[in-house]
Amino acid sequence: MEAILEKVDDSNISGIHAFIFEGTHFDMPWHFHPEFEFTYILESSGTRYVGNNISDFEPGDLVMIGGNLPHCWKNENDHTGTSRSIVIQWKQDIIHDLEVFRPIQELLLRA
């Protein structure tokens, strides 16, 4: 399956886009974007696809995703209830020039 390019909302002057997803299912298609991302699962379970890794997910999972790495979360077909997550996406260059963030930058580049 070919990943689609997601256009992340870049209207925030800080370069950070944060939101809470809430719906009946995690239904975002297999996608990628140049921004880094943290996804924290608040409610729901199913299968997480990140790059060439396929894993189960459950509430409390926190995943860091590197830029341009394809990913998506999928609930099982018989899933009922609510799917909720906190998603934080940021441009790669917002921490690039700050020395205090160098260890984080190195970690993100390996993600």
Residues of each region from the PLM?
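A hydrophobic/aromatic-rich effector-binding and dimerization subdomain
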Residues: 3-10, 66-111
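Generic protein-terminus/edge-of-domain signal
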Residues: 1-62
